[in-house]
Amino acid sequence: MTKKEFSQALRRGLGSAIIELKRVQNNMDYSDIVLRYCLRDIAHDPQVEGTKGYYLYSAVKILNNPEMFLGKIIDRFGKRLYWRLSEQLYDILCCFSDDGYKDADDALEKKYNDLKNRLPTLLKYNLVFCEREQFDSLMIRKLSSGFSTFKQSVYDIGEMITKRGNVDCVFFDFVLDCAKDKFGEKRVNGFISEMCEKSTAIKFLVDTLEESELSRREYQENMFSESVTVEYLLQNARAAASYEYPRFKMLRYRLMFVKKASDEDYMKLAYTVLREKDDTVKALLLMIFWRKPFPLDITPLIEYSKSDNALLSEIALEVLKYVKDKRIHDLAVQLLAEKGLDSFALGLLMKNYRKADDDIIRKLIVKTSNVLQHVQSDIADIYTHHRSETAFPILLHVYQRGECSHCRGNIVRAMSHCKVLSNEILEECVYDSFEDTRRYAKRLIARNSK
């Protein structure tokens, strides 16, 4: 493996990078690359992947000189960082701490104290830094030290709220849930009730959390108790069409509609879609058919998929991907030939795949040096619904070049479904950056060894 190949594999979180470090004698030649990625956020989508902190620490440990990394990681962690990088460094330092490095403990404690002192004084809370979320993570980490440490965190929160004069400086609800899971709901609730009697700040925080939870429940109950008519959808679609990202404005109404809509309601909505003249409004109405078959002839939807209006084209393809029809297969092949993977047409093959499509997909996939997340997802959907031994070159390329480690886990499952998951790939997956993939690989290896 060249340094460039190692760098690409490490950035993507592939187990092959860890195996390479174990294999080569002069693995310190890779130390600059490992350090660079420790100090740089390399997560693609942390909401589904988490961070690659544990994975990077695995690489650091193999190099047999972790102290060389620890000081630089601590220096970086001590600065004011945006949330994603801070979480990655936090996860690495937690691994150091678990292995007994006191300097890592001190760095985590210092960050906790810095945020404890700074958060009450800020005029506003920048979403780039998400420092209240960072403080949450540090409080959750401290739970491992025992109930007395949790109690101290509650005292600290009381002081922060008193200093600021309101509860804006902390979140705490997730920390409270974690504490209940660890120490028991009865014990935690008893202590919080006791603190509410002693501290007006803590009582104010608890009351605020309870009011927020009550408001959330009332909102959900009200949202799903309302019956949304087609006329109401049309009215809101026209209002949403003027926004920069209009489809997000319709998500709530889609949930409300599908909860109670009858077949007659869907039929009425379908005719409304066909009659609508404005393409953006038409698209917003069409998106209500979320995993629900369009009840009329799909010929107009096929035409919409070729529209110059990007939103209408995109949503038409999303609706058509759940329909099995020869015309949709032909459309997918046509769009892939004309626009390639940028056409979002791969998803149409989930229900309309044919063996001959492997060659079409392979020729497009191997041209891409970096496979985008939506392509990874579509490939995984196709080959977990259909079995093809000739799909291995496609799946291998997407596995090695995909940008999302969560989607890579689904690619590995597709390999298994198609019976092309090799022992070499399975061994790599044991060291993958995504925890679910590591677990899946270990489970398969254990099953195969019986």
Model-derived features with residue positions:
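N-terminal "cap/leader" segments of large eukaryotic alpha-helical scaffolds
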Residues: M1-L21
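Long C-terminal tail modules that include membrane-anchoring/sorting signals and adjacent low-complexity
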Residues: E318, H397-V398
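Buried hydrophobic core positions in alpha-solenoid tandem helical repeats
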Residues: F6, V34-L39, I73-F77, A104-K111, ...
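Terminal, non-catalytic domain-edge segments
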Residues: M1-K4, E424, R443-K450
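Repeat-mediated protein-protein interaction surfaces in helical alpha-solenoids
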Residues: M1, S227-A237, D263-L269, D325-I328, ...
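Core helices of alpha-solenoid repeat scaffolds
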Residues: T2-K3, S31, F135-D136, D168, ...
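Structural detector for internal amphipathic alpha-helices that build alpha-solenoid repeat scaffolds
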Residues: A17-D29, R40, H44-N65, D75, ...
